[in-house]
């Protein structure tokens, strides 16, 4: 039963209930700075702690002590936006006017392009490997000592380990956090908001078991690509990619990839500005045991000199053509 005399602390990195009568200058450990998202990294501006994994980043312990506060923060997205990602001089900025050589593509307003989820298939081998590994992780966690107060690592859950088995259902988001064009949402339920605080308060869409421990798994991955028979194929080599967290979308000119791998303990976020146009509805994704294969149907039958559009190289080729 909730103690109505206690208030909710809205400091970033805290989120605990507190008694106003016992709120001194050492009561709260939090992040006074705002969140900052750049090149797949999630960063706290106050201490520069960063991670590509949203859950790991959210669980970084605060860097400052002070009193708890029950005042809800203003839209901190606007504050974070003041920080420049690339403060180039105006004359150094390259203006992108196309994804290919001039005249090769029909003119298209980028703001009107609609992203589509690519069809995802999972191989039987990948399904079996995931089930086996997750069972091993669950059994290991139950037998290992867990520190009292350890937070649940599932996205959207703030439950702390209290010494019992914590068998009550864990309401959480199994998907990955997506940040795109000012919007924040979970790939598992797609409830979008521009307010970071509202995003964090979204109730989980799935019930399951709490996860009080992170298992150390290598988070490295590599990628390559090739073209054959009218398809351009991107291979992302990583073990234990979780299908339910995969958010792979394309608007025909770009592809965005966000998913958890390492059986849920690492994440990858990739963005591709493609050299030429593809057909999303005729493209597909195959999640295997050790790699994720993204096959993109080419709209034009021409060969691709490279996977990504390069403003400098393609502008130069345009002039020489």
From Swiss-Prot:
PROSITE patterns (UniProt xref): CHORD (PS51401), CS (PS51203)
Binding site for Zn(2+) 2: 31, 46-47, 63
Effect of deleting the gene: RNAi-mediated knockdown results in reduced fertility and in high levels of embryonic lethality with none of the unhatched embryos reaching the comma stage of development. Among the 40% of embryos that hatch, 98% reach adulthood, but have a reduced brood size, and the remaining 2% do not survive beyond the L1 larval stage. Surviving adults have defects in vulval development, whereby 3-5% have a protruding vulva (Pvl) phenotype and 1% have a multivulva (Mvl) phenotype.
Pfam families: CHORD, CS
Biological process annotations from GO: centrosome duplication
Gene Ontology MF annotations: zinc ion binding
Residues given in the record as Zn(2+) 3 binding sites: 152, 157, 170, 210
Protein name (record): Cysteine and histidine-rich domain-containing protein 1
Species of origin: Caenorhabditis elegans
Source species taxonomy: Eukaryota, Metazoa, Ecdysozoa, Nematoda, Chromadorea
Gene label: chp-1
